[in-house]
């Protein structure tokens, strides 16, 4: 089993792979996918193995970095052509996911800003940007949690609706982040989920 460090999406830079918690296997099994091929990344996004707009976006950014790092292109032109193909293919995997297009475009901007640089520099820039997007998602969700946890200090129960927990993002979730942070701070409460969205 791969260590996701409590995350749903993880960039294993040591082995240059995208690690995803396979949400189609939940709640019966915990399966972590190790992805390094474009077709496997597209399949994971298309078939809802990764769900939640923020998680999908970060998965695509990490996927682009993984594919770029694995490129055997000999010229900058070859590298850029390969990059554009990979970005376009991932973006089409789930056209309605706004964060997917946003993250792919962030990676395009990074590649474009470094288009004259040697391939190794472009790869490093894409890796750095994917790591930034990954870290930013965790930081934003954590901040939501910190602000919201203060509102829950005198609360015994919370009612939640929709998939806004940690499975929808890299780590903390959005609407449920305050519950996770409040728990970290030692506050316990009941959480009622009036809806689930299983894969049917």
List each model region and its residues.
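Positively charged, low-complexity intrinsically disordered leader regions
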Residues: 1-39, 43-46
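N-terminal active-site beta-alpha-beta segment that forms phosphate/nucleotide-binding
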Residues: 49, 53-200
